[in-house]
Amino acid sequence: MTTPLMHSSIKSLKLINQGKVRDIYDIDDRHMLLVASDRLSAFDVILPTPIKDKGAILTQIANFWFEKLKHIVPNHLTGIDPNTVVKDPAEQAQLGPRALVVKKLKPLPIEAIVRGYLAGSGWKEYQASQSVCGIPLPAGLQEAAQLPEPLFTPSSKAEVGDHDENITLEKCAQLIGPELADKVARVSVQLYKEAAAYALGRGIIIADTKFEFGLDEAGELYLIDEVLTPDSSRFWPQDQYQVGSNPPSFDKQYVRDWLESTGWNKTPPGPALPDEVAARTADKYREAFERLTGKPF
């Protein structure tokens, strides 16, 4: 039985960044070590209760998609075993299936969001303006409706604890250049369409998702970070989907619902989760992995 990992401690390498979930260590000028912890954030606040096996599940779901979608765009995987980089047995014990050695690339300063259904902030904006990220949509759409075509709706990257901001396609082009913005939009929609069609066959609707990209020294585009996981996507069970209502998602829904019921003001520090809420959340992550891959975790 694995012990949940809240924070990694790899003293043999230099910690260069700690995100909401991942700890990133410097290996050399071409490689980094990513360690996906069992931290859980909700409402942009990291909660004090870890979710068992979450980091390993996220890493293995992302690896599954990286392999399945590599014909569309190259990715940051190297195939290098983390245990060949980290030699100390106590440090190796923190790695296992949660760790990856990846290419060191220059990340683009945008999140590449693709929406296939009207949900979350997109639904709120549609109600106010009949558009999403400034893109006009037909009248009369209901919550959770499938959009006529998947939409590329980028956002700016925020620091940990801040909210990402939706940006227009014009602003995206200003940030990364029009040619690259067009390529990112095209690749993102292609990734989404292929993944959504596959997932639907496994009983999961991918309502929306967030991709991240980086460039190598030659300017080639790579898919980086995590891909099509319950943390970066809104997964709905197909058998519970109904237009006009917000389906339960395969991620932090139990946690969000419980937090809403506590009256917590959504600012740090977050409250500790009851065992039942943490366990049901862990079950949902595991179910997403098993449904998508067809393998037991």
Swiss-Prot record:
CDD domains: SAICAR_synt_Sc. InterPro entries: SAICAR_synt/ADE2_N, SAICAR_synth, SAICAR_synthetase_CS. It holds the Pfam family SAICAR_synt. It comes from the Bacteria. GO terms for molecular function: ATP binding; phosphoribosylaminoimidazolesuccinocarboxamide synthase activity. NCBIfam families: PRK13961.1 (NF010568), purC (TIGR00081). This is Phosphoribosylaminoimidazole-succinocarboxamide synthase. It comes from Methylobacillus flagellatus (strain ATCC 51484 / DSM 6875 / VKM B-1610 / KT).
